UniProtKB/Swiss-Prot annotation:
This is Isoleucine--tRNA ligase. ATP binds at residue 594. A motif ('HIGH' region) lies at residues 47-57. Its main location: cytoplasm. Its cofactor is Zn(2+). Catalyzes the attachment of isoleucine to tRNA(Ile). As IleRS can inadvertently accommodate and process structurally similar amino acids such as valine, to avoid such errors it has two additional distinct tRNA(Ile)-dependent editing activities. One activity is designated as 'pretransfer' editing and involves the hydrolysis of activated Val-AMP. The other activity is designated 'posttransfer' editing and involves deacylation of mischarged Val-tRNA(Ile). GO terms for cellular component: cytoplasm.
Length: 1059
């Protein structure tokens, strides 16, 4: 054990600890210690290797690391490979940007093989960057052998899963509407669509009813470009629709509009007058045929038999009639399936109209809005704009379209019920994340489109014969090599595209062009990280995962994709427990964005305050499942907390080193806390109390950690450090550290501080691994494990927990706060003693606590006596105050006289009479409780303050003896400050002189009693106290200072003895 002189410097401390971990290979050695423990299989949700980590990524990994460190200290053998998502559009778009590409054509021209290699290089480079950033956060995962979705063995895990889907009849080729990015020219998942406000046209259009002159169905849309694909109009059977004769500019039209919306629509169309001809139920309109207003521009529209259909989702807004284009909307597509409508989709992969769109061919669809509107001519009833939330590609930010295309699907709807049953078997943190949020999402989920029309991803392992149409799904690379007779060195595009499988018909099977949705990559992580299906041993022993945790958006992402793939492959969930955490936002609850200028990076926090502060802060700020609203002031609060921890740790070391203190060890030189257990009954109250408190802390944190209430644990730890340890126990025990002679009291103090710090650093280790390691490294005994992270999680020692003592100490702390307030009111500093402190209470608990801990109360109050009085204290007088709102109405003209009588009365006697009899006679008038209130009239020099269930009274009146002690304490404080300025060791003796410019004060502190007290406290081998008229003393000292001590001028000089 060494003395620590340096202040808390987190960056220097953490760099040193991480260097030690690296040099000593500490992580691997900790794993070795736990290798025989019960396995705990954790699957790391893989971040995309697209750049540097952000605050949300850091928070995510910190949560994971904290929980895994906790379980490791609980004896578990943690299986914890880091993982990285290294395929997909996130990587492709980054590489395209680097190469200056804007379209798939650019990639084709560049060469798929060359582009793939660029993607591979980018992904691996950024994986290494991110791994280093995670290491800097103190994250202990297996970064030397992470699972990588680009590896051949990982790709096989995905191939095997889709082969299982084929075997179970859960894989199909379908023509459906999907989210489509026209820039990336691929389908994208619902979870990959980002929404923000966008302004679009808002138009009302008249569709002419077949066979009825000047009669129209009025629809509304914000996507005019979808009108060339219109095939139907939907109405609600629950609504009433009006057939209206509307007049404008001398002509009349017959319009069909939802009855409640007639006036708003006609007003928008600037009609002057109207008459309702009839009202019908929506179901009566079903089957009505109409013509396309664009039949002249889009030839195919003339071939479609347009009609009205019923739909429950139609809302009573705009016109109450909805334009249906099954090729451009999911709900429309479902109606089309139900009604047998054509899914007409004259739009290509790049978002341009095809030749089937007639006059609009080759135009980008969203650019065509104005032309479509112009082509409507007189069929346009009204045109406005609307600002609404619209979907965009998550990677390139292009506005998406909905497009009917041929894709590969997993039939998630057929396994929906098994998935819901599996959700109920999983332990969710918090519970509602599974039972409500995730359950509802899965309940409403659609079949999963697993195909993408891109390059850098896991190739879908489906080979299809061009002649007979037969298809086969390959499960492993070995199977592919066997079936094809060709070697497959890299299962990526374009290499795997060249592999041909002979078909039984005599033809050739070629691989379909698509790659997997990147979400399917990570969906198989729980078995891919175990090497399955190549290797079975680890899978059979460990799968499914014991625990995973990711952000709340992963209910639509990774939580779901894993559940879907695993239910397809194994019929069960791939995880046993899931923690869902929130989003990292700014202080105002907004998403962090460069455009807002509100981004805070982990590096910013780490560089200013250190890794442990960042770690502790993000765990302390809120419950894991709530959003983190980052706040710099709170970060500073945590920095102060760890700084206080460091100072508490430093505080006893000089005394321990000076006294050659060796903590009592157990068998093999291992510290086991046995000294405290063996001597607890002989130890002072404050020692027994802090020992009880740290064990109570261990008990509560154990329960909270089981439920992953990380915020409760960190807040309890912070409160213990600040309130229990620093602001209370250290203040109580400090004088015992200064004792010159060896004594049981000093030994108890040393052993207690050591015991508490050893327990505390073990509790802190998962949260602040660096400072815990640093403190432990200096405190550990020869037989102790080499790292704090090799220790077992501290269990509460129930024999050392004293609930009654903890309750009593809370009373004393409340008393201490009240004394401080009363002294402040009386302008008497705590260093100055007072004659008497009285506590008036009706609480037996307060009375018992202050009597049992009276010595402690006396010391804290710096009072000659501390008395507890039940009832009333006889020195308290009462001042009577009239209540005029009661006196006026009852006494009328006599009111002023009654008022004067009450004000002049003996308030104490009047209060006693009313309390005794319910009334009192005063000058011939009957005074009741309603007529008067009473205020305390404290004796001169007595000041009061409330505490819980009591009132504290402090008499600050000074006597010569009290004044002498007060001045002596002031002198001691000044000399101690001067010792610090001279940087003296705690055991250095000094010589000192105190020259006082006041005869009376000089004579008070020159008394032998106080000279000895001062000399003893400041370790003065020689001390002179004398009267001075302001002249400088003739001696010279190493340090001389003038002080104003409560208005008295003093000159103090000190030097190290012997110099």
């Amino acid at each position: 054990m060494k003395e620590v002189t340096g202040s808390y410097n987190p960056r220097e401390l953490e760099a040193g600890v991480q260097d030690t971990w690296k040099r000593e290979n500490t992580y691997a050695r900790v794993q070795e210690v736990r290798k025989d423990g019960k396995a705990f299989f954790f699957v790391d949700g893989p971040p995309y290797t697209t750049g540097h980590i952000h605050l949300g990524t850091a928070w995510n990994k910190i949560i994971k690391d904290t929980i895994l460190r906790y379980h490791r200290m609980g004896g578990r053998n943690i299986i914890e490979r880091a993982g990285y998502d290294m395929h997909g559009l996130p990587i492709e778009v980054k590489v395209e940007h680097q190469l200056g590409f804007t379209s798939k054509k650019d990639i084709e021209d560049y060469g798929i093989a060359a582009f793939i290699e660029q993607c591979r290089t980018f992904a691996v480079t950024h994986m290494e960057i991110m791994s280093e950033q995670f290491r800097q956060l103190g994250i202990w995962l297996d970064f030397d052998d992470p699972y990588q979705t680009i590896k051949a063995e990982y790709i096989e895990s995905a191939w095997w899963a889709v082969q299982r889907a084929e075997e179970r009849g859960l894989l199909e080729r379908g023509h459906r509407v999907v989210n489509w990015c026209p820039r990336c020219e691929t389908a994208i998942a619902d979870s990959e669509v980002e929404y923000w406000d966008e302004t679009d046209p808002s138009i009302f259009v008249k569709f002419p009813v077949t066979g009825r002159e000047n009669e129209y169905l009025v629809i509304w849309t914000t996507t005019p470009w979808t009108l060339p694909a219109n095939v139907a109009v939907a109405v609600s059977p629950a609504f009433t629709y009006a057939r209206v004769a509307a007049k404008k500019d001398g002509s009349e039209e017959i319009l069909w509009i939802a009855d409640e919306l007639v006036e708003s629509v006609l007003k928008m169309g600037r009609y002057q007058d109207y008459t309702v001809l009839e009202r019908v139920n929506g179901s009566d309109l079903v089957g009505t045929e109409y013509e396309s207003p664009l039949a002249g521009q889009v030839p195919h529209q003339a071939e479609i038999r347009h009609r009205v259909v019923a739909a429950d989702y139609v809302a009573l807004e705009n016109t109450g009639l909805v334009h249906i284009a099954p090729g451009h909307g999911w709900d429309d597509y479902l109606i089309g399936i139900q009604e047998g409508l054509e899914a007409f989709c004259p739009v290509d992969a790049g978002g341009c109209f095809t030749r089937e769109a007639g006059a609009f061919a080759d135009m980008y669809v969203r650019d065509a809005n104005d032309l479509v509107i112009d082509a409507l001519g007189d069929y346009l009833l009204a045109r406005r704009t609307i600002t609404h939330r619209y979907g965009h590609c998550w990677r390139c930010k292009t506005s998406i379209i909905y497009r009917a295309t041929a894709q590969w699907f997993l039939k998630a709807t057929e396994i929906r019920e098994p998935m819901l049953q599996e959700i109920a078997k999983v332990k969710w943190y918090p519970e509602w994340a599974g039972s409500a949020r995730f359950h509802d999402f899965v309940r409403d989920s659609r079949d999963w489109c697993i195909s993408r029309q891109r390059y850098w991803g896991i190739p879908i392992p489906i080979w299809q014969c061009e002649q007979c149409g037969e298809r086969t799904v390959i499960g492993t690379i070995a199977e592919l090599e066997e079936r094809s007779g060709a070697r497959v060195p890299d299962p990526h595009r374009p290499y795997v595209d060249e592999v041909v499988i002979p078909c039984s018909c005599g033809g050739e099977m070629h691989r379909v062009a698509d790659i997997f949705d990147v979400w399917f990559d990570s969906a198989v992580a729980s078995w891919a990280t175990l090497g399955f299906p190549r290797e079975r041993e680890a899978f059979d022993r460990l799968w499914p995962a014991d625990f995973i945790t990711e952000g709340q958006d992963q209910t639509r992402g990774w939580f779901y994709s894993q559940l879907g793939a695993s239910t397809v492959a194994f019929g069960r969930a791939p995880y046993k427990s899931v923690l869902m955490h929130g989003f990292a936002l700014d202080a105002d609850g907004r998403k962090m964005s460069k455009s807002f200028g509100n981004v805070v990076t982990p590096e910013e926090v780490m560089n200013q305050f250190g890794v442990d502060v960042l770690r502790f802060y993000v765990l302390w700020a809120n419950a894991p499942w709530d959003d983190l609203k980052f706040n710099w002031d709170s970060v500073k609060t945590i920095h102060r907390t760890l700084n206080i921890l460091w100072n508490v740790y430093r505080f006893p070391l000089p005394y321990m080193v000076l006294d050659s203190f060796e903590p009592a060890a157990g068998d093999g030189g291992l510290w086991d806390g046995s000294f405290v257990r063996g001597n607890i009954n002989d130890m002072p109250e404050e020692d027994r109390w802090i020992i009880s408190r740290v064990n109570s802390l261990a008990r509560t944190t154990a329960g909270d950690m089981q439920e992953y209430h990380l915020h409760r644990v960190t807040r309890a730890l912070a409160a213990f450090i600040l309130e229990d340890l620093s602001r209370w126990y250290v203040q109580l025990v400090r004088p015992r550290m200064w004792l010159e002679e060896d004594s049981p009291e000093k030994r108890y103090a040393y052993e207690t501080v050591y015991y508490v710090m050893r327990r505390l650093v073990a509790l802190l280790a998962p949260f602040t691994p660096h400072i815990a390691e640093e403190i432990y490294g200096n405190l550990r005994l020869a037989g102790d494990p080499e790292s704090v992270h090799m220790l077992d999680w501290p269990e509460a020692d129930d024999l050392l927990i004293a609930p009654d003592l903890e309750s009593a100490m809370e009373v004393v702390r409340s008393f201490d706060d009240a004394v401080a307030t009363a002294r402040q009111n009386g302008r008497r500093k705590l260093r100055w003693p007072v004659a008497e402190t009285v506590v008036v209470t009706g609480s037996d608990g307060v009375k018992t606590a202050l009597e049992d801990l009276n010595d402690l109360a006396l010391n804290r109050a710096n009072s000659r006596t501390v008395r507890v009085v039940t009832g009333r204290w006889d020195r308290i007088l009462w001042q009577a105050e009239p209540v005029m709102r009661a006196i006026g109405p009852e006494f009328g003209k006599e009111g002023p006289k009654v008022k004067a009588l009450i004000e002049g009365a003996d308030g104490t006697a009047l209060k006693a009479a009313i309390e005794r009899d319910g009334k009192a006679e005063l000058g011939g008038y009957e005074i009741a409780e309603r007529h008067v209130t009473f205020a305390e009239a404290l004796p001169e020099g007595v000041f009061a303050a409330p505490m819980k269930d009591a009132t504290v009274y402090v008499d600050v009146t000074l006597t010569p003896a009290l004044e002498a002690e007060g001045y002596a304490r002031e002198v001691i404080r000044r000399i101690q400050e001067m010792r610090r300025q001279l940087d003296l060791n705690v055991d250095d003796f000094i010589v000192a002189a105190v020259d006082v410019a006041d005869d009376r004060v000089a004579s008070l502190i020159a008394e032998e009693e106080w000279q000895k007290e001062i000399a003893g406290e400041v370790r003065a081998a020689a001390l002179t106290v004398r009267r001075t008229d302001g002249e400088r003393p003739t001696e010279t000292f190493a340090l001389e200072k003038d002080w104003d001590v409560e208005g008295v001028q003093m000159q103090i000089g000190i030097s190290r003895a012997g110099e």
